[in-house]
């Protein structure tokens, strides 16, 4: 048997490392009999949905304020590794199902979704390297050639920044570019111009968790006005070449059945009208988490009102969970889903959720988390699944830029076969 074909798992290792916010996370290694080693790091969110898979933390206040992950590391070494040794790394579903069964809980709270996901991703990387093919080809096959439109978070608010802005993310979307390389350049130029615009107005240009600027602004509309001004000043046409997108993260300011923004409570119908006004006034193509994760009735109303005009993305609403997505499909709530690997906790379940979305004409947006690492798996995942969209932060901070640079390399590898989703109308509406 050749070196590359002996893909049995020989050893599994894990360690506690730091993410981009200086908080602990897991790094996992999967060693194969052929000498190949797959390495993966697990991200962590700041604004998390109530129905996400459980991220296991130590709770020991004497280490990292209780945020340590030594328990999850121990679970990889003592609970998962002994049961996975000898299994074929190329059988991703068997590996993932085995880990899910060992955990035995409905939300991976026994061993930790962070423990399971680390091994899941490391095994996939080892499998790809064993076959001497890139991860996007390993996961997506010969049709994996669609480069995603980036939704670039350039103004941070909400839980991602220490400022007074209600909405969590204000994004620029280079829909009019003809290639990913061009789209990235457009985004970088608008980002640099936005820095100048903020500076000219005496606003701070410090950045939030995801690399976007985090100034104190009078309202959400002011943030949108600044983006439109930066797009124009950079030499691009708002809405035609570079559009806007929002992550409202409404669950973060939902209290007692009301949406509290601009310092005042508003009824759901009133808030939906407000979002509609923003869509009418600005070149917005996508709104994420426009309502609370359990406000299903209002989600239906929002989708009826704005679903034909803009992309309505469920993040906290769906948490990359096929069961919750199925409910959304049946109730006609949202028309797109945000995909975060650590929300569900395994590669297999992530791919199943994307497949369910695709079969029901629900668009998928592959996403990072606010606590990231240098791991670039989501770039490959976006191409592998032909999702057509990716969220991986701003145009600064190396843990964000690493994903963009990986997509540049993939585009170069594909050569003439590479297709940019924005150029063929497969980005956000």
From Swiss-Prot:
Mg(2+) binds at residues 247, 288, 315. Its EC number is 4.2.1.11. One of its GO terms (biological process) is glycolytic process. InterPro entries: Enolase, Enolase-like_C_sf, Enolase-like_N, Enolase_C, Enolase_CS, Enolase_N. Binds a second Mg(2+) ion via substrate during catalysis. Keywords: Cytoplasm, Glycolysis, Lyase, Magnesium, Metal-binding, Secreted. It holds the Pfam family Enolase_C. This is Enolase. The gene is eno.
């Amino acid at each position: 048997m050749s070196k590359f074909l002996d893909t049995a798992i020989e050893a599994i290792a894990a360690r506690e490392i730091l993410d981009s916010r200086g908080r602990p996370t897991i790094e996992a290694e999967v060693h194969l009999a052929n000498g190949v080693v797959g390495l993966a790091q697990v991200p962590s969110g700041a604004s998390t949905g109530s129905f996400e898979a459980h991220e296991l933390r130590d709770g020991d206040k004497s280490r990292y304020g209780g945020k340590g992950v030594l328990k999850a590391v121990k679970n990889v070494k003592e609970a998962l590794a002994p049961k996975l040794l000898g299994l074929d790394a190329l059988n991703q579903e068997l590996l993932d199902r085995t880990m899910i069964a060992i955990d035995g809980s409905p939300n991976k709270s026994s061993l930790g979704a962070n423990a399971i996901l680390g091994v899941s991703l490391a095994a996939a990387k080892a499998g790809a390297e064993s076959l001497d093919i890139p991860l996007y080809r390993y996961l997506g096959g010969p049709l994996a050639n669609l480069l995603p439109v980036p939704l670039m978070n350039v103004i941070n608010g909400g839980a991602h920044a220490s400022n007074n802005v209600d909405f969590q993310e204000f994004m620029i979307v280079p829909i009019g570019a003809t290639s990913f390389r061009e789209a990235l350049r457009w985004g970088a130029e608008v980002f640099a111009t936005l820095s100048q615009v903020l500076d000219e107005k005496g606003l701070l240009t410090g950045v939030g968790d995801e690399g976007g600027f985090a100034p104190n602004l009078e309202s959400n509309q002011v943030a949108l006005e600044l983006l439109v001004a930066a797009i124009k000043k950079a030499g691009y046409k708002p809405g035609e070449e570079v559009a806007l997108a929002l992550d409202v993260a409404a669950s973060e300011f939902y209290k007692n059945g009301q949406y509290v923004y601009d310092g005042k409570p508003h009824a759901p119908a009133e808030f939906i009208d407000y979002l509609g006004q923003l869509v009418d006034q600005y070149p917005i193509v996508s709104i994420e988490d426009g309502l609370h994760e359990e406000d299903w009735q209002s989600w239906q109303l929002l989708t009826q009102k704005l679903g034909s005009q803009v992309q309505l993305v469920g993040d906290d609403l769906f948490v990359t969970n096929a069961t919750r997505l199925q409910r959304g499909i049946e109730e006609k709530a949202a028309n797109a889903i945000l995909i975060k690997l650590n929300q569900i906790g395994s590669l297999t379940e992530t791919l199943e959720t994307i497949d369910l979305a695709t079969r029901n004409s629900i668009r998928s947006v592959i996403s990072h988390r606010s606590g990231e690492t240098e791991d670039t798996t989501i770039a490959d995942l976006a191409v592998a699944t032909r999702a057509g969209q990716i969220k991986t932060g701003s145009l600064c901070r190396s843990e964000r830029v690493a994903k963009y640079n990986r997509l540049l390399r993939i585009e170069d590898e594909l050569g003439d076969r590479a297709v940019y989703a924005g150029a063929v109308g497969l980005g956000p509406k």
